[in-house]
Amino acid sequence: MRTFALLTAMLLLVALHAQAEARQARADEAAAQQQPGADDQGMAHSFTRPENAALPLSESARGLRCLCRRGVCQLL
């Protein structure tokens, strides 16, 4: 009976270790995908406010644009 318990515990530890390795590999892959690469250095998003928006803008705010790169937004 003691041998059966030890074998079961060892089998459980091996299964948990394999599962942890798989999770670590997925986490490493996700982290590698989130890091900015050399090819997306120049990628930018530009947002403009449509003229028919619900809230009217003052004359000084008309034509305001936002340029976002790498999580940093600048108003143009």
UniProtKB/Swiss-Prot annotation:
The keyword Cytoplasm does not apply. There is a cross-link at R65 (Cyclopeptide (Arg-Cys) (interchain with C-73 in subunit A)). Residues 23-64, 74-76 form a propeptide. RTD-1 is expressed in bone marrow. Detected in promyelocytes, myelocytes and mature neutrophils and monocytes. There is a cross-link at C73 (Cyclopeptide (Cys-Arg) (interchain with R-65 in subunit B)). Forms a cyclic peptide with 1 subunit B (RTD-2) or with 1 subunit A (RTD-1). An additional intersubunit disulfide bond is formed. Residues 1-22 form the signal peptide. It comes from the Eukaryota. It holds the Pfam family Defensin_propep. Residues 30-44 have a biased composition (Low complexity). InterPro entries: Alpha-defensin, Alpha-defensin_N. GO terms for biological process: antibacterial humoral response; antimicrobial humoral immune response mediated by antimicrobial peptide; cellular response to lipopolysaccharide; defense response to fungus; defense response to Gram-negative bacterium; defense response to Gram-positive bacterium; disruption of plasma membrane integrity in another organism; innate immune response in mucosa. Disulfide bonds join C68-C73. Residues 25-54 are annotated as: Disordered. Keywords: Antibiotic, Antimicrobial, Defensin, Disulfide bond, Fungicide, Signal. GO terms for cellular component: extracellular space. RTD-1 is a cyclic heterodimer composed of subunits A and B; disulfide-linked. RTD-2 is a cyclic homodimer composed of two subunits B; disulfide-linked. This is Rhesus theta defensin-1/2 subunit B. It comes from Macaca mulatta (Rhesus macaque). The lineage of its organism: Eukaryota, Metazoa, Chordata, Craniata, Vertebrata. The gene is RTD1B.
